[in-house]
Amino acid sequence: MDERAALELVGGLVSRAGDDAAVVGDTALTIDMLHDATDFPSGTTRYTAGWRSVGASLSDVAATGATATAAVAAYGAPGFDDDELAAFVTGARDVCTAVGAEYVGGDLDGHSEFTVATAAIGDADHRVTRSGARPGDSVVVTGSLGRSAAAMALFDAGDTERANDLFQFMPRVAAGRVLGAHATAMMDASDGLARSLHQLAAASDCGMAVDSGRLPVADALAEVTADPVERAVSFGGDFELVAAVPPERVEAARAAVPGSLSVVGRVTAAADGVRLDGDALADDGWTH
């Protein structure tokens, strides 16, 4: 059973599962796990690992429209090197500070492989799920896509300094809070835009039609691959927000969202499926 099948199994047993974070009362809550072999390529600093792992949970909270307030991390490693542990905690603390949240500690454990489990909470005054998109809505994306794909290419090429910089994504907490007031459905693109579109379509019982010419592809990605659009769509690891917004609210959302907000397509009927430039888009993306 792969990760996707496992998630479907759990979703069939837990009725409230299926969104980026659970909302209990007025609190959003999420948990994530990352491993050395699947999430941290050779050359990833412990600072970047701290930033990225805690950032992933902050991003999940943001995807519900909640305001992230705090995060914790459990750090497992074969040994506890002073400099590595300090760098990890500093990265975790810094990403929280960057979005107005607080890093409040965690746990340590001896582990055969460097492994991190993180959790974050937030205030959920207004909840957005994956299941509210309707035909006619605009599909929007924050920021740019492909930073992580570019980082992986740079790690492979030995340019670890630049790769680590690209790997330190900014969780869209501020954007999620204001975009959530306009969106009918929203999630983050941690597993890739293609996968996110398929998940939103399935949850909302609709289709998605996206125009490659409208995609906000990161400049760094065009420098390292001959097909930046394909990588930006299918690679994942970017943690931008993908949302459905009624067309009459797009300009208000764009004016309110910090940073860029790109309209990349529209929500269609379920029978149309998920399409890129009119062609069926494969359900590809990051798999742990």
Curated annotation (Swiss-Prot):
It catalyses: thiamine phosphate + ATP = thiamine diphosphate + ADP. Mg(2+) 1 binds at D32, D107. Mg(2+) 3 binds at D20, D60, D188. Its EC number is 2.7.4.16. Keywords: ATP-binding, Kinase, Magnesium, Metal-binding, Nucleotide-binding, Thiamine biosynthesis, Transferase. The keyword Translocase does not apply. Substrate binds at D39, W286. It is an enzyme of class 2 (transferase). ATP binds at G106, D107, R130, S190. One of its GO terms (molecular function) is magnesium ion binding. Mg(2+) 5 binds at D191. Reaction mechanism of ThiL seems to utilize a direct, inline transfer of the gamma-phosphate of ATP to TMP rather than a phosphorylated enzyme intermediate. Belongs to the thiamine-monophosphate kinase family. This is Thiamine-monophosphate kinase.
